[in-house]
Amino acid sequence: NFSTKKQQKKSFEAHIETSIELQKPLFLHVREAHQTFMEMLKPVKEELPKTVVHCFTGTREELIDCVEMGFYIGITGWICDERRGTHLKDLINLIPLNKIMIETDSPYLAPIPHRGKRNEPYMVNFIAEEIAKIKGLTLEEVAKTTPL
């Protein structure tokens, strides 16, 4: 971290306020700060515009909190990784399909079979296929329902 927690909270608060004021989507990336994240967002839940939790890799409890807040959950190529994505595969059914935001996180987190290569937008298809497989749906059902 290059800034103090106090500075980060102040910046995040300004980000939230601006998003509410302009009613523009709130795009969030949280790591190891879920409790603080929720403490800052819950009081303004009703005012928040559409909100995406980018590249979700948190716990079951954190996911439930985010789903209950009505947030979109960003799923990346991480879910295609047999080693690191296992816990996400176990959680994916907790997310309503229309609240899954399929993301590339380009240029990082390329899905298998492209691990180690530069991630590109066309690779979202691999992520959608993995979600379809886990949820027992067709690729078409996932593509029609998720906000790609």
Language model regions located:
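Aromatic/hydrophobic pocket-lining residues that form π-stacking "cages" and hydrophobic walls in ligand
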Residues: 15, 128-131
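Active-site gating loops and adjacent loop-to-helix segments of metal-dependent hydrolytic enzymes
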Residues: 106, 122-124, 128
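Non-cysteine beta-strand/loop elements that form the S-adenosyl-L-methionine
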Residues: 98-106
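Short histidine/acidic/glycine/proline-rich micro-motifs that form metal-
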Residues: 77-81
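Divalent metal-binding pocket/active-site signature
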Residues: 1-69, 82-86, 90, 95, ...
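Solvent-exposed alpha-helix faces
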Residues: 129, 147-148
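Amphipathic alpha-helix from the class-I
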Residues: 132-136
